[in-house]
Amino acid sequence: MSKINLTLDPPYNGEYYTGTEQISGHVSIQIEKPISIKSISIKLKGFIQTLTKIDSDQMFNNNSAMSPIQDNRAIHNIVEKSHRLFPPDNVWNALEGSHKPFKVKPGLYEYNFEFDKMPKRPECLARHKRDTDSFVKRNETRMPPSFNNNWKDMSRVDNIELYYYTLGKVIYIVQVEIELGKALAWYKPFNKFLHETLNIDYIPDAKDLIYVEDPEDYIARNSRVESDEQLIESIQNSLALNNNNNNTNNNIDNNNNRIKNKNININDGKIDNDGISTNSNTESNQVLTGDIGSNNTLMGRNNNMSVNSENRLNEHVIYKSSFSVQLPDESSVMWLEVRSRGLRHTYRRDYLFRQGSNKFDNIYLVLEGDIEEMFKMKINPRKIQLNLLEQTVYVAQGIANENVSSLRLVEALKICDDDDEFGRIFQFNPIQVPSNLHHRHHNNDAHNKKYEVELCLKDHSILKRIRFNKEDYVHRGNRLYSFKTCTIKRLFKFQLLIDWQINDKIRTTENIIDRTQIFCQVREKVNVVDTLPQYVEPPQYTETRHTTTP
């Protein structure tokens, strides 16, 4: 009867639409025989949909049989815009409320359309109730990016991992809707609609994807703010060997999803092998260094300004190993520290190990114990592996499900291929006392001191050239970006694994960079001012007359 063709103008970057551009396109309708049409409209819609399931183990109790497992669904409409293409405004206004259809002759009808820029905030906020479960505060909610656009291709029953992953989605569509005239028959009481729909990829600008950490979660999980004296004391005590720790952790199964209910404490497993003592409190593995001001506010050491939730991202953070490694003398331990200012925000094509990248360019091996016994040991770094851990959480009707997967960035790379490179990257001798403890360490016992050795991965011939997500990788149908919205949050962590040869045994250290925000955009240049080219004086010409004599 009719054929609808919907074409969108390509985005500026040729890949996805952003918040700074308008979505436009062209509609062509081929009508083969006369038809009654009431209206033709073009719509832009966006919605968030989550579906969560209760683990069957949670349905059992001692007094009753298992109840039927119910799915919990939540749908949030975040944007809806509509433009009428037919009839034109002057005709529509002249109808004065009449809903009679128009008899349209066969032929080709074409229309152009253009929507305004995407709003900054979703429309569902106006319908949020006070007790609505949400991962973000009302005043911090922004438009989310497209997520799981290709969910139909991934939600196959033969791949259970992707099936659970696609239970949360953010979809944006452009849709043509043709409302046909009402038929004059009792058995056809409703109007008929014809539709043509296209999915679009929408990713807001990086500044609109930045989410604010929950202050309570930030303090409880990610950092400790301490004065110099408190910092020294905490460094001396926080990673002490805990031989009485009987807590067991589940290993992370790479590329495997786990479903957990909201009331279950979700913890990622840590590597545990012989000779390794796992810290009972992993919350102390990160330390945000700074000074306490007169009003109990954190003061930046370099800029002497109050630090809020935004500029905390630029503070010097120490990411300690998840566990300490016991050395062969059984009285000394060692751990690894990643000291960084820039791992909170990581953009595509950022250098990871290069000097000045503020990522993994400042790494130290810290040892505590008898220095004389340490010098008798052979401690060498052998292999490095860097993983990106993805955590997606969906919530619906008070039930939350979690999915965990892993993406390998650097795979089991040898740290040192020859003696010359080994000397540049790691020298166990000489060993030095940490600079921040050198003048304040009150314990003169040489058998119970802390020492550090720099692991110069920034000088590695391969690592110093590695950029994050240089190829714009698509993981499970989505680019690499973090975001939080009403019922979906997608978070990332870096996991740094280094194998150490201690005498004749291999031990592994693990550093988790928690709550890093990942962006698929390339970092914008900062402090670059567009200026006119330097003025150059134009050349001067002199006129010379040539005369001829008769």
From Swiss-Prot:
Lineage top rank: taxon: Eukaryota
Entry's localization field: Cytoplasm
Xref: InterPro entries: Arrestin-like_C, Arrestin-like_N
Region named Disordered: 275-303
GO cellular component: cytoplasm
Keyword set, alphabetical order: Cytoplasm, Endocytosis
Location (main, coarse): cytoplasm
Biological process terms in GO annotation: endocytosis
Bias (Polar residues): 277-303
Pfam families: Arrestin_N
Family membership: Belongs to the ART10 family.
Described function: May regulate endocytosis by recruiting RSP5 ubiquitin ligase activity to specific plasma membrane proteins in response to extracellular stimuli.
Protein's name according to its UniProt entry: Arrestin-related trafficking adapter 10
Organism expressing this protein natively: Vanderwaltozyma polyspora (strain ATCC 22028 / DSM 70294 / BCRC 21397 / CBS 2163 / NBRC 10782 / NRRL Y-8283 / UCD 57-17) (Kluyveromyces polysporus)
Gene: ART10
